[in-house]
Regions:
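N-terminal mature ectodomain segment of secretory-pathway/periplasmic proteins
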Residues: 485-488, 492-560, 582-590, 606
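An aromatic/glycine/proline-enriched structural segment found at the starts
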Residues: 22-29, 218-283, 442, 446-472
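M16/insulysin-pitrilysin zinc metalloprotease superfamily fold
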Residues: 93-96, 124-154, 284, 303, ...
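M16/MPP (pitrilysin/insulinase) zinc-metallopeptidase core fold and M16-derived inactive scaffolds
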Residues: 64-126, 166, 186-190, 302-318, ...
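Scaffold signal of the M16-like zinc-metallopeptidase fold and its non-catalytic homologs
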Residues: 21-26, 92, 164-213, 234, ...
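A structural supersecondary motif
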Residues: 276-278, 300-341
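C-terminal regions of mature proteins
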Residues: 21-33, 218-220, 371-481
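Gly/Pro-enriched, hydrophobic low-complexity segments
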Residues: 227, 597-612
Length: 612
């Protein structure tokens, strides 16, 4: 027993001594940089020009194949959208198998195959991969473009365009591209109702026959493969794919504006402004300052700890998030700093965005910011290289951009070598705050007055990117026209005062399901000026609001609270069941044009009501 006690005491004292030597107030020293060994992919080229890259990885019994057609961008012109439609129609049957049988086979194997205008993708368990690659190859090389499927896809495309007609975000992205690249640039054209209606089945077939060729394509196969057997399979399935001469389009040079300007797109239905500060850049993967540019953008707007986010969201509360992106591209790169903000702070947001961009250019970032950004990139890179598909993509980039074989193995070293001067020089070169387009899509009547007080010239464009004039904010109110006149005309239009007065009670019942739980909201109103609003969950009333014409109360979860005098006054003013009768006492504030309709805007207390 004494021996055991002595041993325990000795162990306790040793533990105390070890703990006493640990200083938990200081950060532990970092270990050595991880060494990245990506391995050597297997590469070969078929006689038709198809370049094949195979990456072995036996961690999971799965294989994927990604075919990427690396054509130079081209202009689709009057039939913009034809390539997208062609890609959508691939995989809907081949010359040897119907659409339904094709899909049934893919489902039977528990696999995935998808086609698009610039390639295809397939993945499956290892034992089914030969069958899946065969289906994928058949769908790519022997498609059937039927009139029936074409008509269906045409209608789907038109329906999607129609549903986006009033989308502020869609209009913003569309016009941003038109202005940034130009209409004659492949990146600047867009699909429209007019261009889609001009597309014929023959156009789709011609697009496939012209551009869907192997001699500009890469096939990347990654996963649990036997290289020898897979190489033989690829040769068997793809050697018969006929190569062809692919026409090239001379891509226009993109240019920045001489001086920063505001490009405004008026959207009457916008409840917030879409802001994008954009300039063109010449940046390609592997450029000498590529890593410095990555880090500069990450510090400015790469995430939730970057400068734009911390300023516009955390400090000012203008937006849910503000970010920047630096797009490297062989044909036309761009820098963008963006935010979606409330109308009333649109001008202030522009000022803050520009302030952060110019601060990056004219003042060095701190050593701490640079170090944190490096660690973030290195950490993300180390995690990414654990994924087999990432390794396959790296191999593809090395081929596509003609990079050194050790480009990614030296990635960490090159990131760590970036200096404070390098970051500032990259910011000066790529963040052109002095030659940028500040593209704002929003509601002119709410934001233009303050934007006109900035130092920037404002140019106006419509939803298709065509130059236009400043939109009319309001129209003059005719002499003698009042809120009472407007409401009277509305009452007359819906049936007349007698019929309105005859309705003494209204009830609206709304049903919803939230995470499987049924919810019912009931709203009752009765003359003179009595209301009840009730929310019930699974039959139990969770919240209720009652007004009897003179007083009222609110209750929730068994707690009852009488209405305050201000709430009583507001309830009395509403004049239910038809609140419009109360609006007669409001003010006719303005006549506002919205989508070609002139709306009479009546202001009543804090409410604006639009009458057409």
């Amino acid at each position: 027993m004494k021996t055991k006690i002595a041993s325990l005491i000795a162990l306790f004292l040793t533990t105390v001594a070890i703990n006493a030597q640990i200083d938990r107030s200081t950060m532990p020293k970092p270990g050595p940089d991880p060494v990245v060994k990506l391995g050597k992919p297997i590469k070969f080229t078929l006689d038709n020009g198809l370049k094949v890259i195979m990456v072995e990885n036996h961690k999971l019994p799965r294989v994927s194949a990604n075919l990427s057609i690396d054509n130079k961008p081209y202009l689709e012109g009057d039939i913009a959208g034809v390539s997208g439609m062609m890609g959508s129609l691939l995989g809907r049957g081949t010359k040897s198998i119907s659409k339904d049988d094709f899909n049934e086979k893919v489902d039977f194997y528990g696999a995935n195959i998808s086609f698009f205008s610039s390639g295809a993708f397939g993945s499956s368990l290892t034992k089914y991969f030969p069958e899946i690659l065969e289906l994928m190859a058949d769908g790519m090389q022997n498609p059937v473009f039927s009139k029936e499927e074409f008509d269906k896809e045409l209608q789907v495309t038109l329906d999607n365009l129609k549903s986006n007609e009033k989308s502020v975000t869609s209009a913003a992205r569309r016009v941003e591209n038109v202005l940034t690249y130009g209409r004659n640039h492949p990146f600047g054209e867009f699909t429209s109702k007019e261009s889609v209606e001009k597309i014929t089945l023959e156009n789709v077939i011609n697009n496939y026959n012209t551009y869907y060729k192997p001699n500009n394509a890469y096939l990347v196969i990654e996963g649990d493969i036997d290289p020898k057997a897979t190489k033989a399979l690829v040769k068997d399935l793809f050697s018969g794919w006929q190569k062809g001469e692919i026409p090239t389009y001379k891509i226009p040079e993109t240019k920045n504006v001489s001086n920063t300007e505001i490009n405004f797109i008026n959207m009457d239905n916008a409840v917030q402004s879409e802001i994008a500060i954009i300039n063109n850049v010449d940046l390609t993967l592997g450029d000498d300052d590529y890593y410095a540019a990555l880090l500069a953008n990450n510090i400015l707007g790469g995430g939730g700890t970057a400068r734009l986010f911390m300023n516009l969201r955390e400090d000012k509360g203008y937006t849910y998030g503000s970010y920047s992106s630096l797009r490297q591209n062989r044909y036309a790169g761009t820098f963008r700093a963006t935010a979606s903000v409330r109308n009333m702070v649109t001008d202030s947001s522009v000022v803050e965005l520009q302030k952060e961009i110019n601060k990056m250019r004219y003042k060095k970032v701190s050593a701490e910011e640079l170090e944190n950004s490096k660690e973030e990139y290195i950490g993300g890179f180390v995690m990414d290289v654990q994924k087999p598909r990432t390794v396959a993509n790296f191999a593809l980039n090395i081929e596509r951009y003609n990079l050194p074989e050790d480009f990614y193995e030296n990635y960490i070293k090159n990131i760590k070598a970036v200096t404070l001067d390098d970051v500032q020089n990259a910011a000066i070169k790529y963040f052109r705050g002095d030659q940028a387009r500040i593209v704002i899509t929003g509601k002119g009547i709410d934001v233009l007055k303050n934007l006109e007080n900035t130092d920037y010239v404002i140019k106006y464009f419509d939803k298709e990117g065509n130059p236009t004039v400043k939109p009319p904010m309001t129209l003059p109110i005719p002499a003698g026209m009042t809120a009472e006149n407007v409401v009277d005309k509305y009452i007359e239009a819906i049936g007349g005062k007698d019929k309105v007065d005859a309705i003494k009670t209204t009830m609206i019942v709304s049903n919803a399901t939230i995470q499987g739980t049924p919810l019912v909201m009931t709203m009752k109103s009765s003359a003179p000026n009595k209301t009840l609003q009730e929310i019930a969950v699974m039959g139990n009333v969770m919240q209720k609001s009652v007004f009897n014409g003179e007083t009222g109360y609110q209750s929730a979860r068994g707690q009852k609270m009488d209405m305050q005098q201000a709430q009583i006054d507001e309830a009395k003013a509403n004049l239910v069941p038809f609140s419009d009768m109360a609006y007669k006492k409001g003010t006719l504030d303005r006549i506002e044009p919205i989508d070609g309709v002139n709306y009479y805007v009546v202001q009543f207390n804090d409410t604006e009501v639009f009458y057409d």
